[in-house]
């Protein structure tokens, strides 16, 4: 069942109204910390903040589109630009959360060995690789398989379809035969792989916390911090990617689910700054790393 256009519009507007100031504050806070001491976590937080800010800027147009029942309100030539601005940060955010998770897991489980590779320059390289992977894969899908692409035999502009009602639609009226595999490939590489990495790393972090000397209260706080990124991936970006899997398995499924998933994905711009901001201030996992490092040093 589709959400009413007015409700979809209100949810997009609310996500923009909350997400824009939160991400601006998150980026400013990360920059302030970076001036004192740049760490890999700050590099990932800065990239995640910029990614979410780009996604946030695209939400007003998504709100207008929802209010118009999916009709594209701008010139057709701007559809590919909007597609990259909206979907690239939606996928890149999962990669940055996975990288942040991996860094914290390595710091908690292997504190001495990780220190040798804990360099911001390596983290910048990881972020550049994530951006390149997302943009290249997304660009190939758009150019080859989107409406108006090389493998599409229509004469429409790239990304634009015109259903029977005559209103142009941007990226939401693909032929199911080509849309299903294309979207599934994006979800498999750019969501489910980062999700698996994040889940594995945070289970490892929780095991490290269980064997640490922290108080019960600080263990609970650190455990909540550890689950924040995983919870964001599952609650915000998970429904959209689940709809991609459903439409791949059955082209008749996933339409309404996809619209709801795009809305929950938009709300990642609200939760991500809260998660990364809390991670940046929380002492839990850093204390675990310090305790384990001191313990390993004393044993020597």
From Swiss-Prot:
Its main location: membrane. One of its GO terms (biological process) is positive regulation of calcium ion transport. Disulfide bonds join 79-170. One of its GO terms (cellular component) is plasma membrane. InterPro entries: GPCR_Rhodpsn, GPCR_Rhodpsn_7TM, GPR40-rel_orph, GPR40_recept_FA. Residues 1-8, 65-79, 143-178, 249-256 are extracellular. It is found in: Cell membrane. The chain crosses the membrane at residues 9-31, 42-64, 80-101, 122-142, 179-200, 224-248, 257-279. Glycans are attached at residue 155. GO terms for molecular function: bioactive lipid receptor activity. Keywords: Cell membrane, Disulfide bond, G-protein coupled receptor, Glycoprotein, Membrane, Receptor, Transducer, Transmembrane, Transmembrane helix. The record marks 145, 172 as: Important for receptor activation. It is a multi-pass membrane protein. Residues 32-41, 102-121, 201-223, 280-300 are cytoplasmic. Gene3D superfamilies: Rhodopsin 7-helix transmembrane proteins. G-protein coupled receptor for medium and long chain saturated and unsaturated fatty acids that plays an important role in glucose homeostasis. Fatty acid binding increases glucose-stimulated insulin secretion, and may also enhance the secretion of glucagon-like peptide 1 (GLP-1). May also play a role in bone homeostasis; receptor signaling activates pathways that inhibit osteoclast differentiation. Ligand binding leads to a conformation change that triggers signaling via G-proteins that activate phospholipase C, leading to an increase of the intracellular calcium concentration. PANTHER family: FREE FATTY ACID RECEPTOR 1, FREE FATTY ACID RECEPTOR 2-RELATED. Belongs to the G-protein coupled receptor 1 family. This is Free fatty acid receptor 1. The lineage of its organism: Eukaryota, Metazoa, Chordata, Craniata, Vertebrata. The gene is FFAR1.
